[in-house]
Amino acid sequence: MANTQGTWVMVDAEIGTQGISTVSTVQNHPFGKIVRAKDVGATDYGEGEFIYVKGVASGAVGAWAGYEVEAGAQAGATILAVANGNYPLGLMVSLLDATTDFGWLQISGHGVGKALTLFGDNGVCYLTSTAGSVDDASVIGDVIHNAKGANGAANTVGDLAGEVDINRPYCENRVSLTN
């Protein structure tokens, strides 16, 4: 059974708001804008939060991405998450595959993210050397805080995606309590 993205509809949407799964080549919102949305599809993932960002070369649906929300030249920038990262994380819910694309990353709720291996319910998520993907192999400094596997038993490794529960996940490349 393949894992699929939810059918997200904004809660309390404003007129002119860019849809959650919509990619635009025009910046429609300030970077860092956070909205809530509800999955109204058969996947029934409940509610989640999403943050507005720029795309990144090689971005893909389900990719884990680090993002920057501070003002300045890097505002809204994303990077495909990779081992030894140090940034807040989100899941791409649309094909943000260029720095001229604008859209949303999921930062809380039940979602689907790229995974190199199938990890079980409540499994810890770790960054990998494969950009944008995670697995459950314990590596010092690569743990993703506030993220856990939520696959259940019905999913297969072949779809290279895993269901996860996230709550504003982040990584910090911390290898000891002194660094």
Q: Where in this protein do the model-derived segments appear?
A:
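Glycine-anchored, exposed beta-strand/edge motif detector
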Residues: 2-179
